[in-house]
Amino acid sequence: LMGDLTGSMSAYHAILKRKFTEICTTLFQLIPNLRIGIIFYLDHGSGDPYITKVQPLTVNVEQLQSFILGTPDGFGGDEDEAVEDALHDALKMNWCEINTHSIVLFGDARPHEVSVCPYQHDYFKITESLFKKQVTINTVYCSTGSDYRRQSSLYEVEIGNFSRRVSRLGNPEFFSWIANVTGGIAIGVEQIDDIVDIIKGLAAKDAGKIDELEKEELKITLRPIPALVHIKKQAKLIEERKKLLGFG
């Protein structure tokens, strides 16, 4: 899990504080050999308490919950946020510990261009390196009222196509690009509470457990969850495309 904890995202952090144990319980029951890591990020030089905070991959739910509760929100500086620093941290994660390499990235702002990042982190090259490690990046664009079904179509690119560099994309377009180019799903948030179902759905999707999650959620809600239905539909299309391209 990777997420923006600047001021505009405080409501999402509050939901994670309340609901993360529920998310973990569901996913650990569904997915064998699951490990969860967390990377939170803020911005550079804005008086914030950190740029990124990392919880390495673990099966310890109490440790994960403690990390979420103990990591403070920040303010953020300019409009762009330190997404590139978080991606750089993700590159250093011990991915060999797990079979399915998957990130769920949530936020509402794009990264800095390499010329602006104090550490010269290049999100384009880092994303390509993550893709080569077979890491899928799913994104949740956190702007309430956005149509979750349209997010993937805002920047269409072939899976694995890094031949053309992107730069200075708009915020929603960045979240669309990074998901599409790594074979992930980009989804928007219509209501803040939706993020819980979306995180569970995206994680279950990459582990091949979306059907099982849907059945479990139906027992509770007694009705299909639109975000899960959308994720399942998109996942099928992406898997077909991956096979066509030789990634499946």
How would you label these PLM feature ranges?
Residues 2-248:
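Divalent cation-coordinating acidic motifs and surrounding scaffolds
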